[in-house]
């Protein structure tokens, strides 16, 4: 009733009820309720006599007049610094709050002690002790009442846990009996113990049955959660799985929200009406070094930002002990102080005491000082933040699940290090504090009510005991009952997925037979490969094309009419090309994820689709095609997270190569993406030259991912080009295993002259073939051609053998695969690709002879292909000179032959080859 009176309302009048503070400043004192009611009655009368449109018009005119008269109006994107949900609208709390509080404190203790014990002498592996301490209620309300496990009839929720709060999840699993004390003592010691350890953060790669979603580095969690929620809807709209009763929760830090990935895609959640998504931002006002916003207020900033992007915003600022004070705040003085106090001051308050708060907060106004005149300093000190109030948090979560047609963000005000004691709570240095002193331990124990004696703590301050009351304790039974009712323990990851039928390789025979006299780019060959797979009924609906607004560039527009572009709202307009065969078609059941100019979101979709086999038990195969320059260079961190999450699928780096994308210039022309990709162990990198190679790679990739008895966690990165080239038919007796492992002998040179070898990949194969012809015709040299489909695979194989030999010097680790392959021929070796020399140089150690590497080192630039290739000396003529030079070093020909060839071909003059006979016509 207090809230209703504060709003000037009559409880029986449905036009004047307590309301959710959603975009208006509703927590204001009403100095004349009678006049307020007259205005309300006038509005009611207008609505009865006229229409909502008329009422809207008049309200807007009133706002216009108020602005003209310089009436200070609140911004519609933010509300007062108070709880969004009025006390009178809070639901009944359904659990046993005291019971839950007891084991919440035990979990908080064990989480901190786990990190503390990890700093024992000889270990000292770090950890975050304060984040979970302050966020514990945010998680425990969820675990006890909202988060649904894998066995829930609706399928279970997906929870993105804040990375730095991982100790709390381990501590809870210990209370549940899923982890042992020994497991906790293995925190951050994954390989140094025989029995293994547990990773620092949520890393599925490190705990395959536990963690589902990697949320570090910071910023990835928010973005991936949005696209996970969207992919859930995608599966539902396409009829693959009913996800209507599944919810995505993302727990984030307020400092983390400064990452571009944290905020940069929130509009997508609103555009897609993702009411299956809730962000919970732990607003402890601190980042790693200091306040998130010292002079202003991060909660208010985030409220405006999210509300402006179309989200529902719920603020949980103050705990229940503030309710009475706010009720007495008849003239709004307390709310005014709350509004005007900066985050820096709020942090300082919690680093002092109640007397300080009385003087420097309530003492700012005589009216607020009077509000607390009968409270002790201790009572003032104990006034809690909203994120520590179980009932306030429960009300926010319940409201979030009831919100329809838009996502929700909950902004929960907390104290970093809450409960750890005065030396930790709200301190700037708390991020770097990894252990507690003996006095800190005793104070922490007392505040949490842990039944551990001084003697136990003093025995070895480095190893204070964990606490567990035993499996038969009522608290443990209650905790387990709550999880059983909600569908099982969390976090949990499973890999029980429906099998898919991998079509036979013969399905791709049309791609493998070549293009005849027609020249086609390997990009088009890739599109044709997947188009053939789309015709297979057992596989077609499991393919997920992902495109960042370049479908027409890649020749994928032919998929628009048949597969359609996914849009949950359908297509409520007539497309400008509606009368064309390849018209732009959107539909709720569309298969293509067209992400716009948005590589970050595209990779997030790739992750959601590529991990669906574990998240949803549905094997999906994403094929994300993009400008290769904007893949690993732009979104490498996300692809790293994809590997951590054990995603499966295809990354297709189109318009690849430093010289192949004509004219685009320095920022577009990719000469190093395979080098970057080589650093990611979850990715196998290929640079195929021919269509039949692509067909083999794609088929083998799908089979490795989902073939019978396979299930490899592998991502294929395949570079493909936009330059049309001849596509030969698959040779008889093709060395298929060589193709997959990274190199095979494509052709042998003819004649009786000196022998040499050219190793080529990608579009570089065409220059190698031309060079071989010149060498044979003009210099009598027999040039063998090797197709190097994967320099990276070859280097990894060699490195693995080196490591095996290092660890067991007496054992035979075997010969590197590339060495064995190259021994089929003799003579020097010259490698060429449209990438930097770093790529072919990865195998130098295992090449059994003189080895020269040509590559496109340095920045790209705008020009023709021939000019660029002459500039970088990777064209056919440069290869010829490199081969001749190698033969001269071996004493087989005179060096003057190479010198004359270099002068003849003008290798230092790009102007001599400025015309491109294969340039596309505009």
Curated annotation (Swiss-Prot):
Name of this chain's protein: Pyruvate dehydrogenase E1 component
UniProt entry tagged with the keyword Oxidoreductase: yes
Upper taxonomic lineage: Bacteria, Bacillati, Actinomycetota, Actinomycetes, Mycobacteriales
Role, per record: Is a specific component of the pyruvate dehydrogenase (PDH) complex, that catalyzes the overall conversion of pyruvate to acetyl-CoA and CO(2). AceE has reductase activity with pyruvate but does not react with 2-oxoglutarate.
Protein's UniProt keywords contain Glycoprotein: no
GO terms, molecular function: magnesium ion binding; pyruvate dehydrogenase (acetyl-transferring) activity
InterPro entries to which the protein is assigned, alphabetical: PDC_E1_N (IPR035807), PDH/Transketolase (IPR051157), PDH_E1 (IPR004660), PDH_E1_M (IPR041621), THDP-binding (IPR029061), Transketo_C/PFOR_II (IPR009014), Transketolase-like_C_2 (IPR055152), Transketolase_N (IPR005474)
Gene name as annotated: aceE
Coiled-coil regions, chain positions: none
PANTHER family named in the record: PYRUVATE DEHYDROGENASE E1 COMPONENT
Domain of life: Bacteria
One Pfam family here: Transketolase_C_1
Subunit structure, as described in the record: Homodimer. Part of an unusual ODH/PDH supercomplex, consisting of AceE (E1), AceF (E2), and Lpd (E3) together with OdhA (E1+E2).
EC nos: 1.2.4.1
Known catalytic reactions: N(6)-[(R)-lipoyl]-L-lysyl-[protein] + pyruvate + H(+) = N(6)-[(R)-S(8)-acetyldihydrolipoyl]-L-lysyl-[protein] + CO2
Cofactor(s) demanded: Mg(2+); thiamine diphosphate
UniProt-listed SUPFAM superfamilies: Thiamin diphosphate-binding fold (THDP-binding) (SSF52518), TK C-terminal domain-like (SSF52922)
């Amino acid at each position: 009733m207090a809230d209703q009176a504060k709003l000037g309302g009559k409880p029986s009048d449905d036009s004047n009820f307590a309301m959710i503070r959603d975009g208006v400043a509703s927590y204001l004192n009403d100095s004349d309720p009678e006049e307020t009611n007259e205005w309300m009655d006038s509005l009611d009368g207008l609505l009865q006599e006229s229409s909502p449109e008329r009422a809207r018009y008049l309200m807007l005119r009133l706002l216009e007049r108020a602005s003209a008269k310089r009436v200070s109006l609140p911004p519609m994107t933010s509300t007062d610094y108070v709880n969004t949900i009025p006390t009178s609208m809070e639901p009944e709390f359904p659990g046993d709050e005291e019971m839950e509080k007891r084991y919440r404190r035990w979990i908080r203790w064990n989480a901190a002690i786990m990190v503390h014990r990890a700093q024992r002498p000889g270990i000292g592996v770090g950890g975050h002790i304060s984040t979970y301490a302050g966020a514990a209620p945010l998680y425990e309300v969820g675990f006890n009442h909202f988060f649904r496990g894998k066995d829930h009839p609706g399928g279970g929720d997906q929870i993105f846990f804040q990375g730095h709060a991982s100790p709390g999840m381990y501590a809870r699993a210990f209370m549940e009996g899923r982890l042992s004390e020994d497991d906790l003592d293995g925190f951050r010691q994954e390989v140094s113990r025989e029995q293994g350890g547990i990773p620092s953060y949520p890393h599925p790669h490190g705990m395959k049955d536990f963690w589902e979603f990697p949320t570090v580095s910071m910023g990835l969690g928010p973005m991936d959660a949005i696209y996970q929620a969207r992919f859930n809807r995608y599966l539902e709209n396409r009829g693959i799985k009913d996800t209507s009763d599944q919810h995505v929760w993302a727990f984030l830090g307020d400092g983390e929200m400064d990452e571009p990935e944290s905020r940069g895609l929130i509009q997508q959640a609103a555009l897609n009406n993702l009411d299956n998504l809730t962000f919970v931002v732990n607003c402890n006002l601190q980042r790693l070094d200091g306040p998130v916003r010292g002079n202003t207020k991060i909660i208010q900033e985030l409220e405006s930002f999210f509300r402006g992007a179309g989200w529902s915003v719920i603020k949980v600022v103050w705990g229940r002990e503030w309710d009475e004070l706010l009720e007495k705040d008849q003239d709004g003085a307390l709310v005014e102080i709350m509004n005007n106090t900066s985050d820096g001051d709020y942090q300082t308050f919690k680093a002092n005491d109640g007397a300080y708060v009385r003087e420097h907060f309530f003492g700012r106004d005589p009216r607020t000082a009077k509000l607390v005149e009968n409270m002790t300093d201790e009572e003032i000190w104990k006034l809690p933040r909203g994120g520590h109030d179980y009932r306030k948090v429960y009300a926010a979560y319940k409201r979030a699940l009831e919100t329809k047609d838009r996502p929700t963000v909950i902004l929960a005000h907390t104290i970093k290090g809450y409960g750890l004691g005065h030396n930790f709570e709200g301190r700037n240095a708390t991020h770097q504090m990894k252990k507690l002193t003996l006095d800190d331990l005793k104070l922490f124990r007392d505040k949490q009510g842990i039944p551990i004696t001084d003697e136990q703590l003093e025995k070895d301050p480095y190893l204070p005991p964990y606490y567990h009351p035993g499996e038969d304790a009522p608290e443990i039974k209650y905790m387990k009952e709550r999880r059983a009712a909600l569908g099982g323990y969390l976090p949990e990851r499973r890999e029980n997925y429906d099998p898919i039928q991998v079509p036979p390789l013969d399905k791709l025979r049309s791609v493998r037979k070549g293009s005849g006299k027609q020249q086609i780019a390997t990009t088009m060959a890739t599109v044709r490969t997947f188009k053939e797979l789309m015709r297979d009924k057992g596989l077609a609906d499991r393919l997920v094309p992902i495109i960042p607004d370049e479908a027409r560039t890649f020749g994928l527009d032919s998929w628009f009419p048949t597969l359609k572009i996914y849009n949950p709202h359908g297509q409520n307009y007539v497309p400008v090309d509606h009368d064309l065969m390849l018209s732009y078609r959107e539909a709720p059941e569309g298969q293509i994820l067209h992400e716009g100019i948005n590589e970050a979101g595209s990779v997030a979709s790739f992750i959601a689709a590529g991990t669906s086999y574990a998240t949803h038990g549905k094997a999906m195969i994403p094929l994300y095609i993009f400008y290769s320059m904007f893949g690993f260079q732009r979104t490498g961190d996300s692809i790293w997270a994809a590997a951590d999450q054990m995603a499966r699928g295809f990354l297709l780096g189109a318009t690849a190569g430093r010289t192949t994308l004509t004219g685009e210039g320095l920022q577009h022309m990719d000469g190093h993406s395979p080098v970057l990709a080589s650093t990611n162990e979850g990715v196998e990198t290929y640079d195929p030259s021919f269509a039949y190679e692509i067909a083999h790679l794609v088929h083998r990739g799908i089979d490795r991912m989902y073939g019978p008895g396979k299930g490899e966690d592998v991502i294929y990165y395949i570079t493909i080009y936009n330059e049309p080239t001849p596509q030969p038919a698959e040779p008889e007796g093709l060395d298929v295993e060589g193709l997959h492992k990274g190199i095979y002998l494509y052709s042998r040179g003819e004649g009786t002259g000196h022998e040499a070898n050219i190793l080529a990949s990608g579009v570089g194969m065409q220059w190698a073939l031309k060079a071989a012809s010149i060498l044979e015709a003009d210099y009598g040299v027999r040039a063998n051609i090797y197709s190097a489909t994967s320099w990276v695979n070859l280097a990894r194989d060699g490195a693995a053998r080196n490591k095996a030999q290092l660890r067991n010097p007496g054992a035979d680790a075997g010969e590197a695969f590339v060495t064995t392959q190259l021994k089929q021929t003799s003579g020097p070796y010259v490698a060429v690709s449209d990438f930097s020399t770093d790529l072919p140089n990865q195998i130098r150690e295992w090449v059994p002879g003189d080895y020269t590497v040509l590559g496109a080192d340095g920045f790209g630039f705008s020009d023709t292909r021939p000019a660029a290739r002459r500039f970088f000396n990777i064209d056919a003529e440069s290869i010829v000179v490199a081969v001749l030079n190698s033969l001269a070093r071996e004493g087989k020909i005179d060096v003057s032959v190479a010198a004359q060839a270099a002068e003849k071909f003008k290798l230092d003059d790009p102007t001599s080859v400025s015309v491109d006979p294969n340039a596309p016509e505009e």
